[in-house]
């Protein structure tokens, strides 16, 4: 079973060339929002899929400008297809907003997928060279535990002492790992707005995707 994925904007032609270039396709998963022109393009893609005998699933993207939301939805579909035994031939990232394309590229890098872009004028497919990296494997088990604790308790700003006490770890151990994570630019030590003498740990929203805590 061979599947292809694609982001879809206002033009069906940004996706259709991949149907022709990929042999043995039996399933297509399309990511698009509810803009009337996007739905028109989706109707055309459905028509072509019907003619070619290809099953098509549409995944709605509520906010086409929310990179993390789109990436999480895309990765969920990738995992589902893999569990079902599909070979994912390629991810066409040509359609939709720039944020949707960026989300698709991010997922391709994290999941080890091939990706293509389709030229706006010639409709020629352009394979995209990507380094495929499992970012979570760059972290030690201890670092993952610390980041998970920080993310789970992110509502309240925490110092390194707070983290050590909350996790029942030695402060020196936590300080060492925090320093390493800050060096990797995974978290940041910033001034506490309520007490400028204190440094609190801040993490970005992308950490949720990196640690697969969705």
Each language-model region and where it sits:
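Long, low-complexity, Lys/Arg-enriched
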Residues: 1-88, 99-214
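Conformationally flexible catalytic loops at phosphate/diphosphate-handling active centers
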Residues: 91
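Active-site glycine- and acidic-residue-rich loops that bind
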Residues: 94-96
